């Protein structure tokens, strides 16, 4: 059985979303999207954005470093404990939260369309690539895991 790449489809997702995020913030800073700027909510959006970024960093550290994700992938092991018990794709979630946080800090409502598009893009990429591989590799164990744990948004496991 072919092993999954340690990076998976991650670089495609992260690099493309990062480029879009940077360009969007640049465009907003150049006053092309002024109608979406909400100056009266700036402090609140900066706070929420900072929380999202912090959550993303914690998720990444927990998934990659604490749970030795690279070793598990190399050993064809399905991670279902620790941070993986509350979200199936904590590394993707981490980048999603960091990018969303950066967009929130800009305090421009037009930019808040992007996290929705990023979520759709991530869902499609995962379903077409990594989730197929995981299903082929782990079968019923992966199906049960999917029924209990969210793909992207951390939450308490379903019973």
Q: Can you annotate each of these PLM segments?
A:
Residues 88-97:
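Short hydrophobic alpha-helical membrane-embedded segments
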Residues 79-89:
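Short, amphipathic, aromatic/basic-enriched membrane-interface segments that mark the entry/exit
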Residues 1-80, 96-159:
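Membrane-anchoring alpha-helices and their flanking helix-loop junctions
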